[in-house]
């Protein structure tokens, strides 16, 4: 799934054992991607929101702050009447709010609402399935909670209504991403009913995007995705000698560890017998990647013991 993690243990082993070059493509590199496939910190490319605007692929959205459903309905009506064949997406926090907004706006525009608790009912305009909902003709408004956040292609959607404060920056970026693609030169608009909290979070994202648009910012961001790299950086900058836990101590140098200095309690060794398909390199590889995926700093030491 976009390089976040391998979908099955079998697939994971195949990927690990392959010497082929691996290219990971993801729109959300915020979930330990570097742990999963051991991405090279020197070989990467970031296509930012800022660059996509410059390349005229997407357009920066405009925000409008409103404080009532009545005012929101007025803005939606103005936008949709001005722009024929354009659709509006309304994001609600639960099924109750979806039904409430559906009742109000369906009086003016052809509306479909989608939620896991609904049944596919063409007559009422409420659906459980996105595909079933999109089969309806002449839709102008789509109301949902999470169903349209990703995996849905609606280039004609240029108006987004956020009825509540979205919980995370990643979810907000995905949601706004539904309406920013260039389409018929229409500027996307966001109607925010959450006292500008969504707009402020969006501006924080744009500051972040500007930061990773620079060479130093992008390199720092890529490095920060790996806890292993952060731990190593901390150790590298730690004093060579220091005093803590009532002892004078020398900094641990992982590059010069002597395997003979490592003592493993025999009670912790539970290796009893080998199966017919046992492989020591594969066992070590599994242990290495399990620890690496958890964010541990792991070093493989090859010796003759």
PLM regions with names:
Residues 4-57:
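Post-DEXD/H (motif II) to motif III coupling segment of the RecA-like Helicase ATP-binding lobe
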Residues 19-21, 57-61, 109, 155-159, ...:
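Short glycine-/polar-rich loops that comprise or flank the Walker A/P-loop
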């Amino acid at each position: 799934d976009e390089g976040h993690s391998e979908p099955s243990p079998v697939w994971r082993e195949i990927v690990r054992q392959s010497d082929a070059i691996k290219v990971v493509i993801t729109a959300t590199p915020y979930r330990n991607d570097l742990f999963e496939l051991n991405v090279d910190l020197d070989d990467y490319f970031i296509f930012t929101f800022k660059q996509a605007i410059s390349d005229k692929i997407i357009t920066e959205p405009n925000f409008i702050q409103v404080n009532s459903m009545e005012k929101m309905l007025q803005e939606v009506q103005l936008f949709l009447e001005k722009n024929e064949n354009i659709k509006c997406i309304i994001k609600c926090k639960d099924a109750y709010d979806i039904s409430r907004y559906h009742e109000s706006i369906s009086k003016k525009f052809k509306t479909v609402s989608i939620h896991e608790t609904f049944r596919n009912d063409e007559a009422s305009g409420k659906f459980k399935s996105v595909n079933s909902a999109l089969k309806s003709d002449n839709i102008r408004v789509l109301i949902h909670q999470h169903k349209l956040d990703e995996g849905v292609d609606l280039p004609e959607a240029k108006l987004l209504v956020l009825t509540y404060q979205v919980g995370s920056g990643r979810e907000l970026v995905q949601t706004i991403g539904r309406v920013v693609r260039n389409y018929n030169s229409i500027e996307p608009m966001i109607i925010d009913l959450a006292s500008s909290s969504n707009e402020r979070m969006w501006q924080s994202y744009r500051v972040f995007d500007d930061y990773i648009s620079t060479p130093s910012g992008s390199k720092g961001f890529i490095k920060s995705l790996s806890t292993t790299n952060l731990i190593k950086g901390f150790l590298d900058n730690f004093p060579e000698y220091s005093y803590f836990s009532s002892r004078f101590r020398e900094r641990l140098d992982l590059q010069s560890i002597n395997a003979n200095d490592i003592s493993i309690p025999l009670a912790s060794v539970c290796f009893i017998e080998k199966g017919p398909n046992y492989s020591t390199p594969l066992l070590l590889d599994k242990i290495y990647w399990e620890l690496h995926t958890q964010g541990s700093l792991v070093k493989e030491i090859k010796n003759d013991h």
